[in-house]
Structure formats: C-alpha cells, structure tokens
Regions:
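Conserved ABC transporter NBD signature motif
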Residues: 65-73
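ABC ATPase NBD coupling module
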Residues: 74-90, 193, 235-236
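Short coil-to-helix segment of the ABC ATPase nucleotide-binding domain corresponding to the Q-loop/switch region
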Residues: 102-109
C-alpha cells in the first residue's frame, strides 16, 4: 500500500550505469525524488554528481538503466519529446552558461522563446522571475557587468522560468563567498517552499549540515547512503520560511531510506 504521507515522485532513476572508455562513472544508481523535496547530492570530485544531473536532464545517455520524469521514460524517449520534458526540469549549470552578448532580460527570456511563447507572455513571466530573484532593476545589464552572486541569480531565474517540477543545481554556490552563498541558498529554499523539488549537488558540508532535509552520498559512482533528516524549525525561521505542514521540527539523525 502506498504511504499517504509519501510525496508524489517527480523523478525516478533506476539501475543507472555510465562508463567513459574503461572508467565507470555511475554504477547501478537508484534514486527517487518526491514533489517538494530538497535533496543534497554530496560526494567528492569525480563521484559522478554532475554526470547524474546531466542524465536526469537528458543531456547525456546512460549505458544501462533509465530515468523516468512523469510519463517520460529515457529508454523510450523520442528526440522531439526532449524539449517538452525539459519544460518540467530546470537546471543551473556549474558555470552559469550565460550569454554575454545579451542582457539579463534576454538571457532569461530565451528559455521561453525556444518553446514558442508569445512576446506578451514572455515579458510578463520574465518580469515575475526577475522580481522573484531580486534582479528586475538589472534587466538591461549584461552578465559580464554583474557580480558572481548576481550572475547566479540570473541562472536561477532562467532555470525556473518554465515553472519546473524539479530544479537541478550543480554546485550553485561553488565560487561564491559565504554571505552570497547564504543568500543563494535562501532563494533556492524559497523556490522549494512553493512546491518545486530541488536536487542540489554540492561540496559545501556546512550548507548540508545546516539545511539538509535529505542527503544522498555518492562515492565512486554509487550511492553510499540516502539519509532523511527532520528539518529543524530554527533553520527555516533563519531564512524566513515557515515550517512545512506535517514536518517534524526535530532532527532525526540516522534515518535511512
């Protein structure tokens, strides 16, 4: 029987295996992320975190296994379906991938233009997300003139422009100072509080220790541990977000899935 308290599954990863030449990158990875979950993907460099995110985004194919996003199954996916699937998945790349020859507005709008949105819809939605990430006043600036934290906010705005069910974040605070790191995580937590699931790859153990709800440890391409923690009330209070309904406010260390 299905647990009525179990969140609806947004993505499912089953027996995923990836090799490059003779090197195994991912080995028999199984992972499910539920609606509204915030999952930290933790592991050393070379553990396979970025590769796993690219495969969920259908930017890279596994040698074995499959990724399921809603009704889309990677092993049965047609090339023409990939743009439709990607409307359900937002991704923040490690190097931002912003276009320096376009202003902030156009960098965010491009994700709507490629799916054929009308100009009026594009303008309305871009204004909404730039306001959400605190960059509306920078809409006509070029990315090269922005700070690292501001560039990351542009990347986040672009990733959420299509109102995705899940947001993939590849080391989104990797090159930012501690104060800006906290600001970016506050923003991601607020996006998550609206119901968007987040799967975030990180090396930052302090973030995981302070904000982790669920932590997946990846080592040498395999999931070593998958731990769920109760979310401490003070953690959410610290970033101005109410405790989610039905969540135990105490830490539950050691519970594994």
């Amino acid at each position: 029987m299905t647990d009525p308290l179990e969140p609806r599954k947004v993505i499912g990863i089953y027996h995923l295996h990836k090799e490059y030449e003779d090197r195994v990158i991912l080995r028999d990875v199984n992972l499910q992320v539920g609606n509204g979950e915030f999952v930290f993907l933790v592991g050393p460099s070379g553990a396979g975190k970025s590769t796993l995110l690219r495969m969920i985004y259908m930017d890279e194919a596994p040698n074995e296994g499959q990724v399921v996003v809603g009704s889309y199954v990677s092993t049965n996916l047609k090339r023409s379906q990939i743009p439709l699937l990607r409307r359900r998945i937002g991704i923040i790349f490690q190097d931002f991938k912003l276009l320096d020859d376009r202003n902030v507005f156009e960098n965010v709008a491009i994700a709507l233009r490629v799916v054929g949105a009308r100009n009026a819809e594009i303008k309305k939605r871009v204004i909404q997300v730039l306001t959400q990430v605190g960059l509306y006043h920078k809409r006509y600036d070029r990315p090269v003139t922005l700070s690292g934290g501001e560039q990351q906010r542009v990347a986040i705005a672009r990733a959420i422009i299509n109102s995705p069910e899940i947001l993939l974040a590849d080391e989104p605070t990797g090159n930012l100072d501690p104060e800006v790191t906290t600001e970016i995580l506050q923003l991601l937590l607020k996006i998550n509080s609206s119901g968007t699931a987040v799967l975030m790859a990180t090396h930052n153990h302090e973030l995981v220790r302070n904000f982790g709800q669920r932590i997946v440890f990846l080592r040498e391409g395999a999931i070593e541990e998958d731990i769920r923690l109760g979310l401490a009330a003070f953690t959410r209070d610290r970033v101005g977000i109410a405790q989610p309904a039905g969540r135990n406010p105490e830490w539950k260390r050691g519970e594994k899935t």
